[in-house]
Curated annotation (Swiss-Prot):
It comes from Chelativorans sp. (strain BNC1). Its main location: cytoplasm. Its cofactor is Mg(2+). Pfam families: NTP_transf_3. Its EC number is 2.7.7.77. Belongs to the MobA family. One of its GO terms (cellular component) is cytoplasm. This is Molybdenum cofactor guanylyltransferase.
Amino acid sequence: MMSNLPSTLCVVLAGGLGRRMGGGDKPMREIGGRAILDHVIERLEPQCDGLLLNANGDPARFARFRLPVIADPVEGYPGPLAGILAALEWTAANRAGVEWVVSAAGDCPFLPRDLITRLQEARLADGADLAVAASGGQVHPVIGLWKVALRDELRHALVEEDLRKIDRWTARYRLATVSWPHEPVDPFFNANTLDDLAEAERLTTQAD
């Protein structure tokens, strides 16, 4: 990170099943001649102190990206909180001294280039425990800043309480919300369907 803010890792959550696109890995679908995941990495890598990829199944399918691939540590595909937990636990075990992880969806090709800076600055300004992104009046809880020290509490919530929704988790803490403009391109546009892919293709010429 090119700032005096705390060291921060990024985890790209690529564990979605992609049912609305006929199955497979959504981040591997192409827009602008490149995989969505290429766009995500290009935008995140300059901002953070390391990138992780959260995905289940055979990690070899992501080998060309040369990133650590970490699977959900909780069985049953419990959603993005499991991917966040995977990143927090991996960071604690492998990157001593790094206290923060930012999560991002693997199907968001237009992520803001100031994502980490603004999340960290808002957390500090508000004295918050966590921070999440928003645009156009909509909160995007999958795009968030998470404290590594909360990993045991998150594991307990997932395993013992069967908690699945991110907003139920964040409600337990002081939360900062950071808004970005949603025009001309919503930076948190996500490609969930084939129609979304076509729209993303059109938007690539307008994104910064």
